[in-house]
């Protein structure tokens, strides 16, 4: 299997050091972010591209356009700016996340947003990675909803799914769509006290033997079904971000996953 690393795995590392760490881990694919750390807001795209080339890594995506399914206000301008940045830095895709504040978004609005985003992506040769969020307050929880909306928007070939093991588990999903999946995010929850309905990004750590999200079975199912893309670490927990040696921790998680497979 192919491992990739999202910058959120080691957000305190400068981008060049993060790229170097990824290569040292034996991986060659990375994801950069526009939230924490905000690479888009702090570095010229040309510098990002140069750093990636120097380290020998490929930028899979910029994470993330939010809330992509509410196509109003400044969203279109932000989408164009992110897409332009992606092209200039050498990224291949944009991660697209739905509104996640308890507000219901009509299905027709989801389809309309995908239609509006389609030319922005196609004109730049980018893929849109549509990521259902499994939280109860999410406006798009299920992958089947995303797939149907992509079809209704005529977005086949432009959009792929982001399969996130955390959100797959939270949404209670059982179906896998390897032919639709462009990237997989992996993270674990090990806190035995938190109820599934109360799991948040802050609970997401690296995958180890205490994982409650069935990462190993999800990974096995995806591989068995034919998915051959990267699996990208995306832990949000402060205890991961504060690690003195994130490379060692990631190496340990990689070894655990490989041993389980």
Regions found by a protein language model. Give the residues of each.
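N-terminal pre-domain/capping segments
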Residues: 1-92, 122, 158, 191, ...
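Active-site acidic/histidine proton-transfer and metal-coordination neighborhood
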Residues: 16-20, 53-54, 58, 68-161, ...
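Active-site beta-loop-alpha junctions enriched in small/polar residues
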Residues: 6-10, 33-37, 64-67, 99-101, ...
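Gly/Pro-rich active-site loop or hairpin
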Residues: 39, 73, 104-107, 139-143, ...
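C-terminal appended segment following the main domain
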Residues: 118, 124, 226-261
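A short, hydrophobic/aromatic-rich structural module that often spans a beta strand
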Residues: 3-13, 79-86, 109-117, 145, ...
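Hydrophobic faces of well-ordered beta-strands that scaffold small-molecule active sites
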Residues: 3-7, 30-32, 59-64, 94-96, ...
């Amino acid at each position: 299997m192919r491992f990739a690393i999202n910058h959120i795995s080691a957000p305190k590392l400068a981008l060049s050091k993060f790229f170097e760490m990824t290569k040292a881990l034996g991986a060659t694919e990375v994801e950069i972010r526009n939230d924490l750390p905000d690479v888009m807001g702090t570095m010229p795209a040309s510098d990002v591209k140069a750093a990636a080339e120097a380290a020998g890594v490929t930028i899979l995506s910029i994470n993330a356009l939010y809330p992509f399914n509410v196509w109003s206000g400044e969203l279109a301008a932000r989408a164009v700016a992110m897409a332009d940045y992606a092209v200039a830095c050498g990224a291949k895709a944009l991660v697209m996340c739905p509104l996640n504040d308890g507000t219901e978004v009509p299905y027709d609005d989801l389809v309309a947003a995908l239609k509006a985003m389609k030319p922005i992506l196609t004109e730049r040769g980018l893929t849109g990675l549509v990521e259902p969020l499994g939280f109860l307050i999410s406006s798009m929880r299920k992958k089947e909803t995303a797939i149907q909306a992509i079809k209704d928007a005529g977005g086949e070939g432009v959009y792929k799914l982001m399969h996130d093991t955390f959100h797959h588990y939270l949404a209670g999903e059982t179906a896998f769509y390897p032919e639709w999946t462009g990237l997989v995010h992996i993270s674990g929850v090990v806190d035995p006290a938190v109820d599934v309905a109360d799991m948040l990004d802050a609970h997401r750590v690296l995958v180890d033997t205490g994982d409650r999200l069935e990462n190993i079975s999800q990974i096995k199912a995806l591989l068995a079904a034919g998915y051959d893309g990267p699996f990208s670490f995306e832990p949000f927990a402060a205890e991961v971000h504060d690690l003195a040696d994130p490379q060692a921790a990631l190496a340990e998680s990689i070894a655990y996953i490989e041993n389980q497979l």
